[in-house]
Amino acid sequence: MNTSAPVLTADQAEAAALIEEWFYHLNTQIFVLCGYAGTGKTFLVDYVVRDMGLVPGESAVFVAPTGKAASVLIRAGVPAGTVHSLIYTREEDIEVDENGEVISERFLRFVKKEKIDSGIRLIVLDETSMVSDDVLRDLLSFGVKCLCCGDPAQLPPVGGSNTLLTMPVVTLKEIVRQEKDNPIVRLAERVRAGGLPRFGTDGCVEVVPRCECDRALREELFAKADQIIVGTNRTRAAVNREVRAMRGIPPEQLLPTDGEKLVWTLNDWSK
């Protein structure tokens, strides 16, 4: 064990002991670690991996279902990639000219790899709730132990199902000290407990009744917002149109203009 270990919460310490017991002594391939936002799942797993003498990115690989989720791990100091980049190859139809220059390329499908790096002893799967049972089955087919982490309150996979988080081995419940004042974490806790968000400003979160959110108020809120989270693609498109109109961008201007943020929707880590 690492003698200079950081201070863990009580449930983090319990989870760490169970994970190490599972990794060294149990034959089961999967360990399911659940935890709500702010409970320190990423911190705990990174600590446990290093405490067991594994090397993140080498003997222990961290993967997530999307590039966005993987980038969150990377920003936390954990080397990570997507599940698909680990276990699949991309099959493409590529057209070249007489000089061998690529004219066009069209993605066809993902094909499961025959094998992955033999030095991998542990796969850490983050955001497990978003991984379909089919992809999970492919991931487990390589026979490597898999530590599956996730938040049971998050979204299920698009067009699929995932039952892992309904049967966790251990669940982190205690919000770590540095997250207790996070207004988003507080709001999530309140909703999970069956309460309703309180209207008004809570830190950087502003909760507004739909019936009061007229155009003037939306303009005021949108002008100072760094990000706007919505529930559907339809609402997202409507909000984007409204914000662009507020900034004087004509509706026929479909391409991005200077200063607009972009969201890359295709995971292709080779480019």
Where do the language-model regions lie?
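Conserved helicase motor core of P-loop NTPases
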Residues: A15-F31, T39, D138-V144, C149-K271
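N-terminal pre-Walker A segment at the start of P-loop NTPase domains
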Residues: M1-L18
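Short, conserved phosphate/pyrophosphate- and ester-handling motifs at nucleotide-, phospho-/glycolipid
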Residues: Q12, T66, T232
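Conserved SAM-binding loop
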Residues: L8, F62, I228
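SF2 helicase catalytic motif II
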Residues: S118-L136, C146-Q154
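Inter-Walker segment of RecA-like/P-loop motor cores
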Residues: V61-S118
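Hydrophobic positions on the alpha1 helix immediately C-terminal to the Walker A/P-loop
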Residues: L44, V48
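Post-Walker A helix-loop "phosphate-sensing" segment adjacent to the P-loop in P-loop NTPases
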Residues: R50-V61
